[in-house]
UniProtKB/Swiss-Prot annotation:
<dbReference type="InterPro" id="IPR029020">
    <property type="entry name" value="Ammonium/urea_transptr"/>
</dbReference>
<keyword id="KW-0812">Transmembrane</keyword>
<dbReference type="GO" id="GO:0005886">
    <property type="term" value="C:plasma membrane"/>
</dbReference>
<dbReference type="GO" id="GO:0031410">
    <property type="term" value="C:cytoplasmic vesicle"/>
</dbReference>
<dbReference type="GO" id="GO:0008519">
    <property type="term" value="F:ammonium channel activity"/>
</dbReference>
<dbReference type="GO" id="GO:0016324">
    <property type="term" value="C:apical plasma membrane"/>
</dbReference>
<keyword id="KW-1003">Cell membrane</keyword>
<feature type="transmembrane region" description="Helical">
    <location>
        <begin position="304"/>
        <end position="324"/>
    </location>
</feature>
<keyword id="KW-0813">Transport</keyword>
<dbReference type="InterPro" id="IPR024041">
    <property type="entry name" value="NH4_transpt_AmtB-like_dom"/>
</dbReference>
<keyword id="KW-0325">Glycoprotein</keyword>
<dbReference type="GO" id="GO:0097272">
    <property type="term" value="P:ammonium homeostasis"/>
</dbReference>
<dbReference type="GO" id="GO:0030506">
    <property type="term" value="F:ankyrin binding"/>
</dbReference>
<feature type="transmembrane region" description="Helical">
    <location>
        <begin position="178"/>
        <end position="200"/>
    </location>
</feature>
<feature type="topological domain" description="Cytoplasmic">
    <location>
        <begin position="82"/>
        <end position="85"/>
    </location>
</feature>
<comment type="subunit">
    <text>Homotrimer.</text>
</comment>
<feature type="transmembrane region" description="Helical">
    <location>
        <begin position="86"/>
        <end position="106"/>
    </location>
</feature>
Length: 479
């Protein structure tokens, strides 16, 4: 089918309306929190506080790292498609910029409402980045198959559902999930896989050539992987309690990521008949350990336990890219462009299960009395809880997350199927030239034009595409 991809009026109006709405809502609801307010100086003198006791100095280094992950790490990780680099980085930038504003509001209404105002400080910025990181994860499943308007609409609903699910897990079920294995990775992976199933494209084979990578595009994607890998310890520890919990979260993530690299490389080589490595596995499966250790990051997992998690996830994630992704596409019609099920979905579920087991097995011998109370917040509402009770509620949290993801994905997928969002035709997926002004000599694909907003009859055959980037297979080998 041919679609009208001319967004001259629709995209500007959508962006401007959303931003005007954000300005109005921020004006009505949002104010600085105490540590960011000018009145802090008065309180500082009254309580004899030091400047370094401001929350900013504790949290901002972690915020910087998470911010880099969202805009550089996830953005460049998706540049592996040979003709979709502009869109991968540019659309990631767009949806993240909108998402952090909407996340500050949605999370503020659930968690940071004081009277009639949402108070915003550096911890809010970290939580908003967490929310947007999950949106970037979800973007990977529909990469190359949706319009920027669809991405903005999807971000609006995703952030809303994320805030609701996060509130249920953290506030009602009292789940521990410092690194977001459940609230971030599991939720958005299966939310977006459900959306992808509903947006199934029967003739996507027509764009199969552009769905592959090139030597340069894989190199750019590897830059994204390295940024994510380096900063993931900050991601998993960013909102943990100061002191031992935050320290432990960084160590556990560090160990899990390291083990994951070795097993990913081992399995990738073992599955190739000549023992060669697949760059897709190295770009993605090497990060699965950081995803899976998220829930248990601040628990007394022990370094060897973190290594075991990374070891297992490196194997499972790589096997998923080789066997599970093709199965999902051919049998279940789930067209997962980036393989987010293997990097985020399955490792997220593993993380949720390991978190439940680790919580249920917590003991006074391992944590100490004060440490157990502090680590699991066994006070007030939870003062009569045992470690087994905590483990049971961790499982409830995982089940609620999966249910929310599936139901939300169905609803949002049906909305995105409407024909007036400017989505590309099947023969023009994974192509920057559909939505971007390309440098001279690079735009060689024919883009069908349809003056209506509805699908037309049989699609116009496209002119054969000439890629400006050499395919990996066509790069001459140096003897």
């Amino acid at each position: 089918m041919a679609w009208n991809t001319n967004l001259r009026w629709r995209l500007p109006l959508t962006c401007l309306l959303l931003q005007v709405a954000m300005v109005i809502l921020f004006g009505v609801f949002v104010r600085y929190d105490f540590d960011a307010d000018a009145h802090w100086w008065t309180e500082r003198k009254h309580k004899n506080l030091s400047e370094v006791e401001n929350e900013f100095y504790y949290r901002y280094p972690s915020f910087q790292d998470v911010h880099v992950m969202v805009f550089v790490g996830f953005g460049f990780l998706m540049t592996f498609l040979q003709r979709y680099g502009f869109s991968a980085v540019g659309f990631n930038f767009l949806l993240a910029a909108f998402g952090i504003q909407w996340a500050l509001l949605m999370q503020g209404w659930f968690h940071f409402l004081e009277g009639r105002y949402i108070v915003v400080g550096v911890e809010n910025l970290i939580n908003a980045d967490f929310c947007v990181a999950s949106v970037c994860v979800a973007f990977g499943a529909v990469l190359g198959k949706v319009s920027p308007i669809q991405l903005l609409i999807m971000t609006f609903f995703q952030v809303t559902l994320f805030a609701v699910n996060e509130f249920i897990l953290l506030n009602l079920l009292k789940v521990k999930d410092a690194g977001g294995s459940m609230t971030i990775h599991t939720f958005y992976a299966y939310f977006e896989l459900t959306v992808t199933r509903i947006l199934y494209r029967r003739n996507l084979e027509q764009s199969k050539e552009r769905q592959s990578s090139a030597y340069q595009s894989d190199l750019f994607a590897m830059i994204g992987t390295l940024f994510l890998w380096m900063y993931w310890p900050s991601f998993n520890s960013a909102i943990s309690y100061h002191g031992d919990s935050q320290h432990r979260a960084a160590i556990n993530t560090y160990c899990s990521l390291a083990a994951c690299v070795l097993t990913s490389v081992a399995v990738s080589s073992a599955l190739h008949k000549k023992g060669k490595l697949d760059m897709v596995h190295i770009q993605n499966a090497t990060l699965a350990g950081g995803v899976a250790v998220g829930t248990t990051a601040e628990m007394m997992l022990m370094p060897y336990g973190a290594l075991i998690i990374g070891f297992i996830c490196g194997i499972i994630s790589t096997l998923g890219f080789v066997y599970l992704t093709p199965f999902l596409e051919s049998r279940l019609h789930i067209q997962d462009t980036c393989g987010i099920n293997n990097l985020h979905g399955i490792p997220g579920i593993i993380g949720g299960i390991v978190g439940a087991v680790t919580a249920a097995s917590a003991s006074l011998e391992v944590y100490g009395k004060e440490g157990l109370v502090h680590s699991f917040d066994f006070q007030d509402f939870k003062r009569d809880w045992t470690a087994r009770t905590q483990g049971k509620f961790q499982i409830y949290g995982l089940l609620v997350t999966l249910a929310m993801a599936l139901m939300g994905g169905i609803i949002v997928g049906l909305i995105l199927r409407l024909p007036f969002w400017g989505q590309p035709s099947d023969e023009n997926c994974f192509e920057d030239a559909v939505y971007w002004e390309m440098p001279e000599g690079n735009s060689t694909v024919y883009i069908p034009e349809d003056p209506t907003f509805k699908p037309s009859g049989p699609s116009v055959p496209s002119v054969p595409m000439v890629s400006p980037l050499p395919m990996a297979s066509s790069v001459p080998l140096v003897p």
